[in-house]
Design a protein with these regions (language model features):
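Helix-loop-helix hairpin linking two adjacent transmembrane segments in secondary transporters
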Residues: 138-195, 202-255
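Paired small-residue
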Residues: 99-107, 380-389
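A late C-terminal transmembrane helix in Major Facilitator Superfamily
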Residues: 146, 334, 408-439
């Protein structure tokens, strides 16, 4: 129906299922928060800390995993990551203390970086004019793993006693990951003509062609470290106390030192190359991925943030029950199965830049009007606005990653890692801002940021889409 070859279809389905399973594993704790709290005698604050730990390492992991994917190929990296996910799931299911849970949820954050591996695999097997559709299906269906974990794992746990139900359910997700690791390695090879000679810079620097791009790369890296610093600050009593204030500042200083070291590495790596002529097959503009990273920080960051706060917003604004608010709030999340592939499909047919302009503008308007919603508005109007906002931004996710692989194919993994990391950075920043402002102001802040991203799109250069022979 979509014009994919048999090999392309097999690759797509094997890869989105691999991504789906990493998300099931990544979110396998959420359905059992209350159960774990009661069984192990944890406080609500400790559960909240574990939820934060679940995403702390995802930001750097996406860049590191993207780099490894460019270097070693997606087949090996995804298979290895699935094995790692399985091992962490099993050790998590055996944990008997807060410390054991803490270490395992930190490690599970690495699994959340698996998204970028599939972006590279799809980019290698699909032509440019079908890239958006394929990437949208991969990401849209794979992301559904988070929702699948929420409604399926409790059903598995119900088959066993309360004491061991959650442990068996979470260990089962690990077993699935391990089985799929072998299936993926056996049946989903890299393309035969992978280029092994493109410099991928394992230390994390992008190969750029000008000092302007080198300066821009240095600027773009800071928010990633900044988000990690913000995590540490939140764990020192703002609002959770896991570490002392002095230790938090020491860790922040250490992160800043690593950031400076990374910048020095970038300059050492690139300065000798800038003076040399750039082959046509390696030429690209770093501003392209910088702008798309801003887009994804908006579309994906907003998605995660609004999913987290929207049920509470409905409950307090319209005085409805917790159950009804949760059910209505889920409407924002479930559009991903259709909207993200739809955004990629539209990009394939009407162009990447044009599609992004329309989707960002639509999300801007929707969230601005959400900021006007109060108890005097009909509940149905708020739901409709949220659905429109969800569709525009989730389709924006698909349109964004329809464009990322077109910048420089040999660096798709690393570029997907950077854009993906920015998505998590956006979520961290939005949720932090939410703790300081009203829900109405929060939605307007999203709209204001969308306006800035909309302006940045004017600097996005057209993408060259090549058709297959």
């Amino acid at each position: 129906m979509l014009g994919f070859t048999e090999t392309q279809s097999r690759t797509l389905h094997l890869t989105w299922i691999a991504f789906f399973l990493t998300f099931v594993a990544w979110f396998n704790m959420a359905p059992f928060n209350t159960t774990i709290m009661h069984q192990l005698g944890l406080t609500e604050t400790q559960i909240n800390i574990l939820m934060i730990c679940n995403v702390v390492l995802t930001i750097p992991a996406r860049i590191i995993i993207g780099t490894l994917t460019d270097h070693y190929g997606p087949q090996k990296v995804f298979s290895g990551l699935l094995l790692f996910a399985g091992a962490v799931c099993i050790t998590f299911s055996l944990a008997q203390s807060f410390e054991g849970l803490f270490i395992n949820r930190l490690l599970m954050g690495v699994v959340g970086g698996g998204f970028v591996v599939g972006i590279k695999m799809i980019a290698e097997w699909f032509p440019d004019n079908k890239m958006g559709t394929a990437q949208g299906i991969y990401a849209g269906w794979g992301n559904f793993g988070a929702a699948a974990a929420t409604f399926s794992l409790p059903l598995i746990a119900l088959l066993f006693s309360t004491d061991i139900g959650w442990r068996i359910a979470t260990a089962f997700t690990g077993l699935l990951c391990m089985i799929w690791a072998f299936i993926y390695f056996r049946f989903c090879p890299d393309i035969p003509e992978r280029s092994p000679d493109f410099e991928t810079a394992i230390h994390g620097a992008f190969e750029v062609q000008s000092k302007k791009d080198l300066i821009l790369q240095s600027i773009v890296l800071f928010p990633i470290y900044g988000a990690l610093m913000l995590f540490i600050w939140k764990l020192s009593g703002h609002p959770y106390t896991l570490i002392t204030s002095s230790l938090s500042w020491l860790l922040i200083a250490g992160l800043f030192g690593i950031f400076i070291g990374n910048i020095i590495q970038c300059w050492k790596f690139n300065l000798p190359r800038i003076e040399q002529p750039t082959p046509e097959d390696k030429a690209y503009s770093f501003s392209q991925i910088a702008i798309l990273s801003l887009v994804y920080s908006l579309t994906f960051g907003c998605e995660l943030a609004v999913i987290s706060i929207f049920p509470q917003f409905l409950e307090t604004t319209f005085s409805i029950s917790v159950g009804l608010a949760g059910m209505l709030g889920a409407s924002y999340a479930f559009m991903n199965l259709i909207a993200r592939p739809g955004g990629g499909w539209i990009s394939d047919r009407f162009g990447r830049r044009r599609t992004l302009f329309i989707l960002i503008l639509g999300g801007l308007v929707s969230h601005w009007f959400l900021g006007e919603v109060n108890s005097n508005w009909p509940l149905s109007t708020a739901i409709v606005l949220s659905l429109f906002g969800s569709i525009f931004f989730k389709a924006g996710n698909g349109a964004c990653f329809a464009a990322v692989p077109l910048i420089q194919k040999n660096l798709t993994g690393k570029m997907a890692g950077l854009a993906g990391a920015y998505g998590s950075v956006g979520a961290v920043c939005f949720l932090t801002l939410y703790s300081f402002v009203s829900p109405q102001d929060f939605f307007k802040i999203i709209a204001a940021y969308a306006f800035l991203v909309f302006l940045a799109l004017f600097f996005l250069k057209p993408f060259r889409v090549t058709s297959p022979n």
